């Protein structure tokens, strides 16, 4: 039971997105169609199977989040995917579990979120601590948790895996699975989606991160913007996870 909240334009790309969501049973009541506004479009250019460039077509507007926000409490978990384009002014969202993929440098905008999932670049911009190794990652995350009352930070380290830091000195390092010639398009979205569904079910951050790690490895083994199924993740875990 998934719902999507956001904006699209009244154009062919918006229609394609709505059609894709409908075909997968996603509730689209929370999507506003804005007249004379282009649907954000990302066009990726590949050479020899590797992405070499990306062209973005977009227009930033002032948008007031619609009525769906009032119903967030009806859902087990809310994923806030922030691209720092002005739509999200702050993360004061009354969700049962709020998990944030941050883009803004000021993590205080996400205060009280349960989990945030920055990559190394995003983490470095949010802290004055020089990120150079796992020890500095833990120090930076611990400081940000203390300042912003997060339950956990899942720091994404690319092909080096993840570091999970929580309150009360909780620290876990998860090694990434090796994938030959990976396509990392959408890998972060796969991580936060898998992490969210697992955490909503188990409330076990380490187990959820392992599940997300396997989901990401499955996704990046496919070309382009790929999705993964529960069966694919379970098969990957059976043959690869320790």
PLM features: residue spans?
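Conserved N-terminal subdomain of the carbohydrate kinase-like
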Residues: 1-77, 227-242
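Structured core elements
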Residues: 3-4, 42-44, 54, 79, ...
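Active-site proximal loops enriched in glycine and acidic residues that flank catalytic Cys/His/Asp
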Residues: 6, 82-84, 102-104, 120, ...
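Buried hydrophobic positions in well-ordered alpha/beta secondary-structure cores of metabolic enzymes
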Residues: 21, 43, 78-81, 162, ...
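A polyampholytic, Gly/Pro-enriched intrinsically disordered region
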Residues: 48-60, 117-126, 203
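Residues that scaffold the ATP/ADP-binding catalytic core of kinase and kinase-like folds
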Residues: 55, 126-127, 165, 219, ...
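Conserved phosphate/ATP/ADP-binding segment of small-molecule kinases
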Residues: 83-85, 90-171
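Conserved post-catalytic alpha-helical subdomain immediately downstream of the catalytic base
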Residues: 151, 177-240
């Amino acid at each position: 039971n998934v719902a999507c909240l956001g904006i699209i334009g009244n154009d062919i790309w918006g229609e394609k997105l709505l059609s894709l969501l409908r075909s997968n049973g996603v509730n689209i009541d929370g999507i506003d169609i804005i007249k004379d506004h282009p649907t954000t479009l990302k066009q990726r250019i590949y050479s020899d199977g590797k992405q070499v460039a990306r062209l973005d077509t977009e227009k930033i507007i002032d948008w007031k989040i619609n009525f769906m926000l009032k119903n967030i409490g009806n859902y087990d978990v809310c994923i806030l995917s922030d691209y720092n384009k002005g739509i999200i002014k702050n993360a004061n969202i009354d969700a049962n579990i709020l998990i944030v993929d941050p883009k803004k440098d000021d993590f205080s905008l996400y205060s009280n979120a349960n989990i945030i999932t920055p990559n190394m670049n995003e983490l470095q911009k949010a802290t004055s601590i020089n990120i150079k190794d796992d020890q500095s990652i833990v120090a930076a995350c611990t400081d940000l948790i203390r300042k912003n009352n997060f339950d956990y930070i899942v720091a994404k380290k690319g092909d080096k895996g993840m570091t999970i830091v929580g309150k009360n000195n909780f620290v876990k390092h998860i090694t990434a699975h090796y994938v030959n010639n990976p396509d990392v398009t959408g890998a972060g979205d796969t991580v936060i989606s898998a992490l969210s569904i697992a955490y909503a079910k188990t409330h076990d951050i380490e187990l959820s991160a392992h599940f997300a790690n396997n989901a990401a490895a499955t996704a990046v083994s496919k070309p382009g913007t790929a999705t993964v199924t529960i069966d694919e993740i379970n098969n990957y875990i059976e043959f690869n996870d320790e």
